[in-house]
Amino acid sequence: MTQDHKLQVEAIRCGTVIDHIPAQVGFKLLSLFKLTETDQRITIGLNLPSNRLGKKDLIKIENTFLTEQQANQLAMYAPNATVNCIENYEVVKKLPINLPKCIDNVLVCPNSNCISHNEPVESSFRVKVTVEDVVLTCKYCEKEFDRNVVILND
């Protein structure tokens, strides 16, 4: 490997790599998806150079693999991210990222009167893709919100 192509974030032997995360979103993903609730090593790259995005974030989690459902829930924040499963330093599987029909226990309802704020229930939103944007409907108060309203509410 030449000096020009040196990895900026160390490779992992086994685990998950979430790449092409928009810059400034990596920490939010770690928090919202509780990715730090592990004793495994996590490597984070922030504001790394990217041909596609200009700048990007990157998360590597050793000995941990995301389910397809978990990967899909990332699409709300990082629609063009890639989720790679690594074994023996090689990519063995790429999980597709598509917006799921439902997102549970990640987002917070922007409606301050929603029971999800006062009751011990997990948040749940139905996801509907429209021509202009993504609309989320809270399972409990049944109010609809544009994606950005919910994301900024976290």
Curated annotation (Swiss-Prot):
PANTHER family recorded: ASPARTATE CARBAMOYLTRANSFERASE REGULATORY CHAIN
Record Pfam families: PyrI, PyrI_C
Example of a GO biological process term: pyrimidine nucleotide biosynthetic process
Gene Ontology cellular-component annotations: aspartate carbamoyltransferase complex
GO molecular function, one term: metal ion binding
Function: Involved in allosteric regulation of aspartate carbamoyltransferase.
Gene name for this UniProt entry: pyrI
List of residues binding Zn(2+): 109, 114, 138, 141
Cofactors (names): Zn(2+)
Extent of the signal sequence: none
Binding note for cofactor: Binds 1 zinc ion per subunit.
Protein source organism: Photorhabdus laumondii subsp. laumondii (strain DSM 15139 / CIP 105565 / TT01) (Photorhabdus luminescens subsp. laumondii)
Name used for this protein in its record: Aspartate carbamoyltransferase regulatory chain
